[in-house]
UniProtKB/Swiss-Prot annotation:
Belongs to the UPP synthase family. The gene is uppS. Homodimer. Keywords: Magnesium, Metal-binding, Transferase. Binds 2 magnesium ions per subunit. This is Tritrans,polycis-undecaprenyl-diphosphate synthase (geranylgeranyl-diphosphate specific). It comes from Pyrococcus horikoshii (strain ATCC 700860 / DSM 12428 / JCM 9974 / NBRC 100139 / OT-3). Its EC number is 2.5.1.89. InterPro entries: UPP_synth-like, UPP_synth-like_CS, UPP_synth-like_sf. One of its GO terms (molecular function) is ditrans,polycis-polyprenyl diphosphate synthase [(2E,6E)-farnesyl diphosphate specific] activity.
Amino acid sequence: MIYRIISHIPKIFFKPAYDLYERYLIEKVKSGVLPKHVAIIMDGNRRWARKHEKPPWYGHLFGSKKLEEILEWCHELGIRILTVYAFSTENFKRSKEEVDRLMKLFEEKFRELVTDKRVHEYGVRVNVIGRKELLPKSVRDAVEEAERATRKYNNYILNVALAYGGRSEIVDAVKDIARDVISGKLRIEEIDEELLRRYLYVPNMPDPDIVIRTGGEVRISNFLLYQIAYSELFFVDVYFPEFRKIDFLRIIREFQKRERRFGR
């Protein structure tokens, strides 16, 4: 609430102090242990659009621009892996108009990634995780093109969860394991937590150190259920298009102050 009141004050009045505080936070964050993997539930696009008396697709468009900013922040700080929750399997239940608009936006953005100079300059590999078969063919083609164009890169990794559900990911992994047991490729005695990890959508990806949810809701919404068992969770009362670099830095700074016990 306080943030939303402050956000209406002309920025010119506090920009010098804001910039100074941002530089201070960057210095502090860079001097500490940085997370290797950050995951974000990008919530609040539609409510942000509603606040501005715009249709839902308008909020998703501005959300995609915010994601581009966050990729720059990660590059600046040296955070190698970013996973974002873009569209869940449950989101298909939204209105046809909104889903169609979103699919068109996804197609456009994945095609833009192929020619984005920053992607190739920074060496960003793009992975799309989820049940891709549920996506329209035009989106699947754009996804495959982006993945193919960036497959050789390994400096930074962007995982986009699309037509994704955490439970579905676990179910799909279990089915693949069962097939390998039946075919004789795998013995039941070999199955453990680490083996199951190898059957997830992105095998052997380090677990997220941090999970951020914007939009003010305090829930996980079926996101990376297997991978976030020991992640540090942060819930921010800011719509995703309004999520600021200073918010991101504060979260990382708080993460650096926490003692991670990993269930011990």
